[in-house]
Structures are given as structure tokens and as C-alpha cells.
């Protein structure tokens, strides 16, 4: 049995916590009746050990063991810094 570690890419929505960020993941879901593709957003709490992310950054995250009640993802790298 092979365990593939899930990795996702999203945008940082909040960086106000110490060593934690909130990342919004956008995905498209087909409506069951009408067939139109709808944009859905999932917010995930992510562990940021070095506090290197800011709001608006595009980041890559991966799944890990539960670190707290809501955190079970960790930061892999910052793909793109936000332009302020």
C-alpha cells in the first residue's frame, strides 16, 4: 500500500497568528442538476514554522499529522510573493 502525501496550492488569506496561516484553496465543482461549473473555496489552517508568509502570497502546502485541533497541513514553499 502506497501513501501519497497530498499537496495543494492556494492563496494566503490571513497571517495574523503566530506560526500559522490560513490558506484559501479554490476548486471548480459541477452543479448536479444544471451542469454549470461553480467556484468553491476551502480554507485550511497551515503551519508556518518561520513566519515567512504574508497575506496574498501563493503557497504550496502538504498534508501532515494533526498539529492541533484545526491544523493538519504544513507549508512547503512560497510560490509567489504578493505585490503590495
Swiss-Prot record:
Q: Name one Pfam family in it.
A: Ribosomal_S17
InterPro entries xrefs:
NA-bd_OB-fold, Ribosomal_uS17, Ribosomal_uS17_bact/chlr, Ribosomal_uS17_CS
Q: Which GO terms describe its cellular component?
A: cytosolic small ribosomal subunit
- Swiss-Prot/TrEMBL keywords: Ribonucleoprotein, Ribosomal protein, RNA-binding, rRNA-binding
GO molecular function annotations of the record: rRNA binding; structural constituent of ribosome
**Subunit composition and interactions:** Part of the 30S ribosomal subunit.
Q: What is this protein called?
A: Small ribosomal subunit protein uS17
The gene name on file is rpsQ
Amino acid at each position: 500500500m502506497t501513501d501519497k502525501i497530498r499537496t495543494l496550492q492556494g492563496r494566503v488569506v490571513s497571517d495574523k497568528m503566530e506560526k500559522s496561516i490560513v490558506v484559501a484553496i479554490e476548486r471548480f465543482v459541477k452543479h448536479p442538476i444544471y451542469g454549470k461549473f461553480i467556484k468553491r473555496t476551502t480554507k485550511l489552517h497551515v503551519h508556518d514554522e518561520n513566519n515567512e508568509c504574508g497575506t496574498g502570497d501563493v503557497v504550496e502546502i502538504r498534508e501532515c499529522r494533526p498539529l492541533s485541533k484545526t491544523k493538519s497541513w504544513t507549508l512547503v514553499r512560497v510560490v509567489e510573493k504578493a505585490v503590495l
